[in-house]
C-alpha cells in the first residue's frame, strides 16, 4: 500500500491566534501577570484585582496609570501591536515588561474582554468590547477614573479541554495570590489588592508607602520578616547589580520560597536556585529550605528576554560568572550572621514515642491499692498528690457579679441543649458535666428555677416539655421552651431555649468533617486532658494543669476555640438558643465592627454605611440556613435575636459580637457546602472562645469594688476552670498539631525536679 503525501494548507488566522493564545495564557494567573505588567508599564501606583471562581468566570483589574488613547482602542487587542518598541534592535535596550504586543490579544482570543480607559487629557472615559482580537463596536463614552479597567469574562470558554483541566477555582485563586504577592514585594512603592468578587476584605493588600520588608511581612508573615538579611552587590565588569532579602540560619521551610526578578521581570532560574541552596545546606537542617527574594539588574544588551512565550525565562551573558558572584556574596552574609542560632524545642509529652520508638512509661504515682498484688513501693518522686476526679466547693458557688463577658450570669445552672456528639466523644466517666435532663425533668427543673429566681417567667418554664412526637417535623419549636436567664439586676435579659429531641444529620459534608476531627485526634493528649487536675489561670489566655507527675501550660484560647468548633460539627443542627430579649440590629453591629481597627477598613473599601447595609442584606438571605443549622436567628427586619447555646451556663463574650457579624459576611466560604460549614463553624468557635482582649482583668478594678462583701473578684477564672476545662475532659478531641505549635507545653516533671532539689 502506497503512502499518499498529505496536503499542506495554510491555517486559518483564527486558528493560529487561538493556538498562540493557549501558549501565552496558560491559566488565569498568567493573564493577571500580563495585565499587571501592562499596569506597571503605564506608571500605575494603585492596582486592584477582583476575581470570581479563581479567575475562570471573571477577572477585573483596575489601575490609575496613563490610560489608552481613544485612537488606539481599535487595535489595542490585535497581535503585535505595542507602544514599547518599534524595531527589533529596540529589544537590546528594552526596559519595559511588554514588548511583543501579545498579552491582550491572546486574552481576547480565549475570553470576552471589555476595556474602560481614560487618559489625563481626556474629557471622559471610553468603553470597548473585544472578541478574537477585534473591536466589536465603536468605543462608547462613559464615566470613569484616570487609568484603565480591564474586564475578562469566561476565560477559555472556547477551549473546552483547558477549562476542564482548570477545574479547581481555589487552586487557581491561590496561584493568583502568589503572582500578585510577588509583584507587590518587588514594587514596594505601589499599592496592590486582590479579593474575590462580592468580598469586602482583600486577601492581598499592600500600601503605597510600605517598604519591601513590610510587604514581605504582609504576604509571608512575621516568621519570615523578622529573620531577614539584606543583601546587595555590584560588579561593573559583569555589568550587573543585585539586591534583595534572604532568610538567616534561624528560618527554614519545607519548600524553598524563591522570588527572582531580572530587570524587574519575574522569572525562574534553576541554576541560581541550586547555587544558593548549596550555600544554605551548611546552615539549615536536612530537607529544609530558605526564603529568597533577589532582584538582579543586568545591562539590557546582555539579556535576551524573548526566549519563552510566557517570558518566565531569560538568558543573559556571563551567566556562570554572575551566579558565582551572587553565591559568594550570600555565603559571606550568612557567615557573618551565624554568630547566634535560635532553636525551638518541644518537650516530649507523656506516652509519646521516644527516639527508640518505645512509648514513655507513665508514672502512675498513686499509692498501691488493695487490689494491687505487686506491692511495689511508690517513691516520693513518683507520687501524684492530686486526683482529677475530686470536686471543689466553689464549683457549686456560681459567681453573681460580672467582671468579664464570658462568665455565666444566672445564679442557678441553666439547662441547655448540649447533647453528646458521638459515641466516641461521649465519655461515660465524666460525672461533672451537666447531663441533658429528660423532657419531664427539664420542665420540672425549669419550673423550680423560675420560682426561685424569675417568678414572672414561670408560665414559660412550664412549657419546656416538648409536645411533638419523635417522628414529627424536624423543625425546632424553641418558643415553647424558653428559660429566662438574668445577666444582672438591671441589665438586659437573654433566653436559653432547649431542644431536647436530637435530629439525625446524614449530610456527607458534616460526616466528613466529623471524620477529619476524629482522625487527627492525639490520643495521648486526649488522655492527659481527660484526667488532668486544674491548677489555675495564668491570665485569660494561659492556664496551668497537672497530669500525673507533670505540669503543663495550656493555651486556653486555642483549646476553647477547638472545643467549640468540634461541638458545632458534632452537634450540628442540634443547638439550643441564647435569645436576646432586645433584638440587636445587624446594621449597628456592622458599623461598630467597621469602626474597630480590627476590621482593617480603609477609605478604599467604600463608605461604611454601604458596607453595613450589604452585610445586613447578605445575612438576611442566609438567615434560614443559619437558624436551622447553627441557631443563629435573624428576623426579617435584620435584627439578631438568637445565638447558639453550645455549653450549659456559658455565654460568649458579647464584646466580640460586632466582629463576629462582620466576619460571617466576609470570611465564610458560602459557595461550597463543606467549606461553608467548616469556615462558619470556625468563625463561630472563634467568637465563643476565651479571648484575652474581651476579659476585664481584676487589676483594673477599684479596690472598693473588689472589696465589696459578697463580690467575686475572679468570675472569668471560675468560668475557665468549672465550665471550659470541665468540657475539655469529655468533649475535646485535641488535634496532633497541639503537640507541635506550642499550645500545650510541659513545664516541669516531678522526677526531674527531684534530681535538682532532692526532695518534694
Swiss-Prot record:
Reported modifications of this chain: Acetylated. Deacetylated by HDAC6 which prevents the MutL alpha complex, formed by the MLH1-PMS2 heterodimer, from being recruited to the MutS alpha complex, formed by the MSH2-MSH6 heterodimer, leading to tolerance of DNA damage.
UniProt entry tagged with the keyword Nucleus: yes
Lineage: Eukaryota, Metazoa, Chordata, Craniata, Vertebrata
Oligomeric and partner information: Component of the DNA mismatch repair (MMR) complex composed at least of MSH2, MSH3, MSH6, PMS1 and MLH1. Heterodimer of MLH1 and PMS2 (MutL alpha), MLH1 and PMS1 (MutL beta) or MLH1 and MLH3 (MutL gamma). Forms a ternary complex with MutS alpha (MSH2-MSH6) or MutS beta (MSH2-MSH3). Part of the BRCA1-associated genome surveillance complex (BASC), which contains BRCA1, MSH2, MSH6, MLH1, ATM, BLM, PMS2 and the RAD50-MRE11-NBS1 protein complex. This association could be a dynamic process changing throughout the cell cycle and within subnuclear domains.
Biased composition (Polar residues): 400-409, 455-472
Location relative to the cell: Nucleus; Chromosome
Compositionally biased intervals (Basic and acidic residues): 417-428
Chain spans, region Disordered: 354-375, 400-488
Species, as recorded: Mus musculus (Mouse)
Family the UniProt entry places it in: Belongs to the DNA mismatch repair MutL/HexB family.
Residues that bear N6-acetyllysine: 33, 241, 377
Motif (Nuclear localization signal): 475-478
GO biological process: DNA damage response; DNA repair; double-strand break repair via nonhomologous end joining; female meiosis chromosome segregation; homologous chromosome pairing at meiosis; homologous chromosome segregation; intrinsic apoptotic signaling pathway in response to DNA damage; isotype switching
Annotated keywords: Acetylation, ATP-binding, Cell cycle, Chromosome, DNA damage, DNA repair, Nucleotide-binding, Nucleus, Phosphoprotein
Residues bearing the modification Phosphoserine: 481
Function summary: Heterodimerizes with Pms2 to form MutL alpha, a component of the post-replicative DNA mismatch repair system (MMR). DNA repair is initiated by MutS alpha (Msh2-Msh6) or MutS beta (MSH2-MSH3) binding to a dsDNA mismatch, then MutL alpha is recruited to the heteroduplex. Assembly of the MutL-MutS-heteroduplex ternary complex in presence of RFC and PCNA is sufficient to activate endonuclease activity of Pms2. It introduces single-strand breaks near the mismatch and thus generates new entry points for the exonuclease EXO1 to degrade the strand containing the mismatch.
Pfam families tied to this protein: DNA_mis_repair, HATPase_c_3, Mlh1_C
Sites where the protein binds ATP: 38, 63, 82-84, 100-104
Bias (Low complexity): 363-375, 434-446
Region annotation Interaction with EXO1: where it falls in the sequence: 412-654
Protein name: DNA mismatch repair protein Mlh1
Signal peptide extent: none
Domain of life: Eukaryota
Entry GO MF terms: ATP binding; ATP hydrolysis activity; ATP-dependent DNA damage sensor activity; chromatin binding; enzyme binding; guanine/thymine mispair binding; MutSalpha complex binding; single-stranded DNA binding
GO (cellular component) term, any one: MutLalpha complex
Amino acid at each position: 500500500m502506497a503512502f499518499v503525501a498529505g496536503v499542506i494548507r495554510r491555517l486559518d488566522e483564527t486558528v493560529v491566534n487561538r493556538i498562540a493564545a493557549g501558549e501565552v495564557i496558560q491559566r488565569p494567573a498568567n493573564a493577571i501577570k500580563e495585565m499587571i505588567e501592562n499596569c506597571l508599564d503605564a506608571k500605575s501606583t494603585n492596582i486592584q484585582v477582583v476575581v470570581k471562581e479563581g479567575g475562570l468566570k471573571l477577572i477585573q483589574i483596575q489601575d490609575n496609570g496613563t490610560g489608552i488613547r481613544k485612537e488606539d482602542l481599535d487595535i489595542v487587542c490585535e497581535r503585535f501591536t505595542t507602544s514599547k518598541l518599534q524595531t527589533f534592535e529596540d529589544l537590546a535596550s528594552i526596559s519595559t515588561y511588554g514588548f511583543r504586543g501579545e498579552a491582550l490579544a491572546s486574552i481576547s482570543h480565549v475570553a470576552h474582554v471589555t476595556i474602560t480607559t481614560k487618559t489625563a487629557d481626556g474629557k471622559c472615559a471610553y468603553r470597548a468590547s473585544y472578541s478574537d482580537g477585534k473591536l466589536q463596536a465603536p468605543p462608547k463614552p462613559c464615566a470613569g477614573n484616570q487609568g484603565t479597567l480591564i474586564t475578562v469574562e469566561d476565560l477559555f470558554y472556547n477551549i473546552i479541554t483547558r477549562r476542564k483541566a482548570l477545574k479547581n477555582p481555589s487552586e487557581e485563586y491561590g496561584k493568583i495570590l502568589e503572582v500578585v504577592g510577588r509583584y507587590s514585594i518587588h514594587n514596594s512603592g505601589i499599592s496592590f489588592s486582590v479579593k474575590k468578587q462580592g468580598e469586602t476584605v482583600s486577601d492581598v493588600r499592600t500600601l503605597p508607602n510600605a517598604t519591601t520588608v513590610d510587604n514581605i511581612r504582609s504576604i509571608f508573615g512575621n516568621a519570615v520578616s523578622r529573620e531577614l538579611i539584606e543583601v546587595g552587590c555590584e560588579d561593573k565588569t559583569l555589568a550587573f547589580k543585585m539586591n534583595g532579602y534572604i532568610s538567616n540560619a534561624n528560618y527554614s521551610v519545607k519548600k524553598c520560597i524563591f522570588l527572582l526578578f531580572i530587570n524587574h521581570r519575574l522569572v525562574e532560574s534553576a541554576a541560581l536556585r541550586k547555587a544558593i541552596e548549596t550555600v544554605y545546606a551548611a546552615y539549615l537542617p536536612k530537607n529544609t529550605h530558605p526564603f529568597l527574594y533577589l532582584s538582579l539588574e543586568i545591562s539590557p544588551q546582555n539579556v535576551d528576554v524573548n526566549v519563552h512565550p510566557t517570558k518566565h525565562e531569560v538568558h543573559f551573558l556571563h551567566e556562570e560568572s554572575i551566579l558565582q558572584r551572587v553565591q559568594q556574596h550570600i555565603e559571606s552574609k550568612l557567615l557573618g550572621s551565624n554568630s547566634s542560632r535560635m532553636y525551638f524545642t518541644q518537650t516530649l509529652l507523656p506516652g509519646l514515642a521516644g527516639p527508640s520508638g518505645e512509648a514513655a512509661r507513665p508514672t502512675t504515682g498513686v499509692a498501691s491499692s488493695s487490689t494491687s498484688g505487686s506491692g511495689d513501693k511508690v517513691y516520693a518522686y513518683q507520687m501524684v498528690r492530686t486526683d482529677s476526679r475530686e470536686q471543689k466547693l466553689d464549683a457549686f458557688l456560681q459567681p453573681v457579679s460580672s467582671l468579664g463577658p464570658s462568665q455565666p450570669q444566672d445564679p442557678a445552672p441553666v439547662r441547655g441543649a448540649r447533647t453528646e456528639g458521638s459515641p466516641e466523644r461521649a465519655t461515660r466517666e465524666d460525672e461533672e458535666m451537666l447531663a441533658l435532663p429528660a423532657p419531664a425533668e427539664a420542665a420540672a427543673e425549669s419550673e423550680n428555677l423560675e420560682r426561685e429566681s424569675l417568678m414572672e417567667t414561670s408560665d414559660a418554664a412550664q412549657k419546656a416539655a416538648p409536645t411533638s412526637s419523635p417522628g414529627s417535623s424536624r423543625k425546632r419549636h424553641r418558643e415553647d421552651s424558653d428559660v429566662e436567664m438574668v445577666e444582672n439586676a438591671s441589665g438586659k435579659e437573654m433566653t436559653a431555649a432547649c431542644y431536647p429531641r436530637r435530629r439525625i444529620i446524614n449530610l456527607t459534608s458534616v460526616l466528613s468533617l466529623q471524620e477529619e476531627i476524629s482522625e487527627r485526634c492525639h490520643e495521648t493528649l486526649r488522655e492527659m486532658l481527660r484526667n488532668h487536675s486544674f491548677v489555675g489561670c495564668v491570665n485569660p489566655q494561659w492556664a496551668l494543669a497537672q497530669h500525673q507527675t507533670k505540669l503543663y501550660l495550656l493555651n486556653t484560647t486555642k483549646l476553647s476555640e477547638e472545643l467549640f468548633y468540634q461541638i458545632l460539627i458534632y452537634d450540628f443542627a442540634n443547638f439550643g438558643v441564647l435569645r436576646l430579649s432586645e433584638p440587636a440590629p445587624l446594621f449597628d453591629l456592622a458599623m461598630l465592627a467597621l469602626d474597630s481597627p480590627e476590621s482593617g477598613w480603609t477609605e478604599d473599601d467604600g463608605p461604611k454605611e454601604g458596607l453595613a447595609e450589604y452585610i445586613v442584606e447578605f445575612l438576611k438571605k442566609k438567615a434560614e440556613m443559619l437558624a436551622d443549622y447553627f441557631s443563629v436567628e435573624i428576623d426579617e427586619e435584620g435584627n439578631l435575636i438568637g445565638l447558639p447555646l453550645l455549653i450549659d451556663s456559658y455565654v460568649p463574650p458579647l464584646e466580640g459580637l460586632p466582629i463576629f457579624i462582620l466576619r460571617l459576611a466576609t470570611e465564610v466560604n458560602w459557595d461550597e457546602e463543606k467549606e461553608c460549614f467548616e469556615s462558619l463553624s470556625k468563625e463561630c468557635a472563634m467568637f465563643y472562645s476565651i479571648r484575652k482582649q474581651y476579659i476585664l482583668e481584676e487589676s483594673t478594678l477599684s479596690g472598693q469594688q473588689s472589696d465589696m462583701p459578697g463580690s467575686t473578684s475572679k468570675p472569668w477564672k471560675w468560668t475557665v476552670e468549672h465550665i471550659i476545662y470541665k468540657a475539655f475532659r469529655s468533649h475535646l478531641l485535641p488535634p496532633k498539631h497541639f503537640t507541635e505549635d506550642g499550645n500545650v507545653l510541659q513545664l516541669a516533671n516531678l522526677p526531674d525536679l527531684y534530681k535538682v532539689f532532692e526532695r518534694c
